[in-house]
Amino acid sequence: METFDLESHLKGAYSSFPEAKHQPVIGITANYENIDATLRDRYYKQVIAAGGTPVIIPPVADSTVIVNTLEHLDGLILTGGGDHNPLWMGEEPSPRLHNINQERDAAELMLVRLAFNRQIPMLGICRGIQTLAIALGGKVYQDIKQMVKHSQDADRSEPTHSVEIKKDSTLYNIYGAEKILVNSFHHQAVSEPGKHMRIIAKSTDGIIEAIESNEYKQILGVQWHPEWLEEEGGKIFHWLVNQANNFYAAKELHKRILTLDTHCDTPMFFPQGIKFDHRDSRILVDLHKMTDGRQDATTMVAYLPQPQIGESFSSKVAFDVQGPAQYADLIFDKIEEIVSKNRAYLSIARTPADLYSDKRKGRKSIMLGIENGLALEHDLSNVKHFAQRGIVYITLCHNGDNDICDSARGCNTHNGVSSFGAKVIQEMNRLGIMVDLSHAGERSFYDALEISQTPIVCSHSSCRSLCDVPRNLTDDQMRALAARGGVAHTTLYHGFLRKEGEADIMDAIAHLEHAIEVMGIDHVGLGTDFDGDGGIRGLADSSELINFTLQLLRRKYSEQDIAKIWGGNWLRVMTQVQNFGK
């Protein structure tokens, strides 16, 4: 019986603690008509039935409002409604175009793009699948040619035609069937899903009925209205709520742990005048992308190309400098300029304590490194010079032998580490700088392991057992590295993950897990090589790094182990090295 006693309604919240268990928050876009923002109850009732907390999102085309809204969401539903204005696709209106909804178009297209940047799980329904496609680079038919009736007269809860589903798809995983029956209320449909999405279901007349992310993101669009299909339709809402719950768990985990990428080459783009405080399409790491991917810190290196015999260093770089050392200094000057312009949000960190302090203060961190000991110019005093500039590691060589050691892509000039290279390693030990053997030849690797009095690192190196290239580490190398307390960080350069086909996030996870099997959980991590040709499908830039965490959570790694992978192991070694140098 209905009661009008407020206290009795609140009893469920007040009689135990906490007042409510956590539920993922699902934003649902509202329709707009005659100054009213409205929503049919079927949408939010399905969300509640699936275990989510629904929040209605009004159509407001204001990026500040949208961004602040998204900060509180774990999932997003794009609802049905009127046609899109074809001008958003660069097309003129067809005579068969129906009523457009100007208030919704810009607001929802912005909403999708900003949610996509943040890796928020999304479900598009009817108009919503079309919103997904348009926002992510696809296209929509203004009016479909129908061989099957796609705008039924039957009751909304009545399925009226079939949909054929691809077996390797989210929909197949949800329904366990290659064909399901759906309702239908549309005269438009997706014509091209765009580069980020793939087709996973069609009707018998070839109309696209469902699309999903082809980048391992939790994004699904369906052309029918599952909110009306009771329990069968509810399965899709359960999928979204489950994904939103996983996303919430990953976000919360990133609040508690430090996330550090140990190698990026963003300074290679400094000659192009990149803007680190913009969402700059020319680079894979910037403040926007780090924030979207909930990444705390990156190690930004001064990369020095190794000249061939007869080449000058100045001919290999864009800036007018006298030599390698001056070039490295110029790169660090420019990083310091970037930090100076963004002091409220960005800092240079030199120690693990600096990183944790920056995280507490809400700032992103950049650590400094040198990729190629060529920067030392055969002058041991330059090790101290760069230590004073705040570098945390030197990658001894790059693609080609130098005066320190032989490269994995070298000519065996020294048969390993040179006599000068041995002095460099000893001086790095003395000054608390990590010795990085990524790019080094196998003999150089073992020599450095014997010479160094502190553990060595491989900031961006994958597994030769899975991708047989000289640049990767053998299992024996990894065992030797672990035995000396070192770490090797899986990299995202496609050619080091697989020799054939396109590398993706699953390849990166496979290399990580092989390294764990060989070395143990205390000796692994991630060094993306972003902006140095690193970046793969599913982990294409810093904004997608939370997807790495999601994959680890799906594989039931503990919070402690994920923290180790995300930089804890690296910082243990850094602490040992820096303490030795004191």
Model region roles, listed by residue range:
Residues 184-188, 221-226, 259-266, 440, ...:
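Histidine-centered catalytic micro-motifs
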